[in-house]
Amino acid sequence: MTIIITKIADKIIKSNRVKNTLQDIHIHSSNCGCHGSFKSNSVMNQTFSSFSSLTTEKNEQQQQQLFKQFSNSKPIPMGRKVELDTSKVIDSVYFGNTENNNYRTNKGNTDYAFEASANNIRFGSGVTYEVGYDLLDMNCRNVIVFTDNNLLKLVDTDKESAVAKCLYSLEKCGIKYTIYSDVSIEPTDTSFKDAISVMGKGRYDGVVAVGGGSVMDTAKAANLYNSYPPADNDFLAYINPPIGKGLLVPGPLKRPLIAIPTTCGTASETTGVCILDIKLGDGLSAKTGIASRHLKPILGLVDPDNLLTLPSNVAISSGFDQLCHALESFTAIPFNQRSPRPLAPNQRPSYQGANPVSDVWSLRSLEMLCKNIHRFVLNPNDDYARSQMMLAASYAGLGFGNSGVHACHGMSYSISSMVKDYKPEGYYGLKKNLIPHGQSVILSAPAVFKFTAPSNPERHLLLAKIMGADISNASESDAGVLLSNQIVKLMKLLNVPNGLQALGYKESDIDSLVKGTLPQHRVTKLMPKQATYDDLYKLFKDSMTIY
């Protein structure tokens, strides 16, 4: 089955029945998912100038003074023009009209309920050493360990590295293992198929993933296709539409998967999603994925010590992925405004729109990230900041894993899949052009949240306030600019490339970028304000240069 993405996009652009198209797709695959200015006395403003002056040989006294500023920072007082009560901001969306949340009285086509789903998470320094005991408890004696070559190389030089600790635990518990390390950074259909094939040749009773999102997503896919091989080995069977067929995963996977993250962004240890880049022919490709609650790891071992070997640029990219998870989750369309209404409970999508449970996790994740990302990037040995960043990533995963993400991620898939001549620093052993996921996500964020702010100004103002904005004299019309400015400040602080032009894109590429975004229904349908072709074109244009 060959699908050319430009044809899909053109059809969507010309169609006058986009809403019906989305509804048909949703019913066909209900489990599709993903994917204000600082004041002069602002702590982050002071940090900005301090951070830019630091060199690789950082002065310890400078660091301590900088960290002290963060630890002593206090929330900015609530605004006078817009009085924000967090619980009211959350509850008013869902419970302002109780008829919208009632099966008997809701006669429309929107949903009336949400479902909170989470897997088991164990957090703490050293929990990686427990993986062998957990596998024994699950009656696993022969497992396949997924990782990447960079992490595997550390085994010989660092006995406290994540893979070294995992293998030590397996050997101590007498568990046989086979290592698969050919995971591709930003996986493709080709790399997924290779992992599926290798796993299928062994008689494994358990799966372990040690790495970032690419590793964990590869392990999920290999486990799925070996648990329920599709008819005629049709790889597109479980892939989200309109790229794939979007068939429902039949049931729980046949081998338990334990995920051990080594980055602080994707939160793949908490979600039932795996993302890949699919080649479509004619030199075109598209980011898409597989989504099902059955894909969630049975256990996530979240060990902050596994971030000690994380390169700073990878940490920054991971942090921005985490940031957008929190922002997009909290601003996604509310669950009771999402349509179509499911025909049965098992057709309710795992990415179901913002809801009271996802809001709690997303807001807390954002608070933790804003207080600690600078400290962590400047000093990975800061135990507190490192632990907070690791835990915040899982919090964000618990949030967006139940609500979803929207425009930033939807746009990022065409940005990363259409990469030109760009290789980021800090991604060792990279053999292909690559735009890191977190980088591709954050570059559109300033424009996106200006666009979505009118859908719910209070929610956007609350996010801006958490990020450090002074909203004391803010009005609802200021919400988008205030939040956008805070995001830009953080991007400058951490030296993110200045827009899509810095990655090699030109204005002549925007049409292709838009057409690559339009089919990403699994995330764009969760936008609180739906975007047309022209809207997306402007969002990409505004993201070309940011500073």
Curated annotation (Swiss-Prot):
GO biological process: glutamate catabolic process via 2-hydroxyglutarate
EC code: 1.1.99.24
Catalytic function, reaction form: (S)-3-hydroxybutanoate + 2-oxoglutarate = (R)-2-hydroxyglutarate + acetoacetate; 4-hydroxybutanoate + 2-oxoglutarate = (R)-2-hydroxyglutarate + succinate semialdehyde
Alphabetized UniProt keyword annotations: Mitochondrion, Oxidoreductase, Transit peptide
Main location: mitochondrion
Keyword Mitochondrion found: yes
KW Mitochondrion (keyword) present: yes
UniProt cross-references to SUPFAM superfamilies, sorted A to Z: Dehydroquinate synthase-like
Superkingdom of origin organism: Eukaryota
Function: Catalyzes the cofactor-independent reversible oxidation of gamma-hydroxybutyrate (GHB) to succinic semialdehyde (SSA) coupled to reduction of 2-ketoglutarate (2-KG) to D-2-hydroxyglutarate (D-2-HG). L-3-hydroxybutyrate (L-3-OHB) is also a substrate for HOT when using 2-KG as hydrogen acceptor, resulting in the formation of D-2-HG.
Family designation: Belongs to the iron-containing alcohol dehydrogenase family. Hydroxyacid-oxoacid transhydrogenase subfamily.
Record-given protein name: Probable hydroxyacid-oxoacid transhydrogenase, mitochondrial
Species whose genome carries this gene: Dictyostelium discoideum (Social amoeba)
Gene for this chain: adhfe1
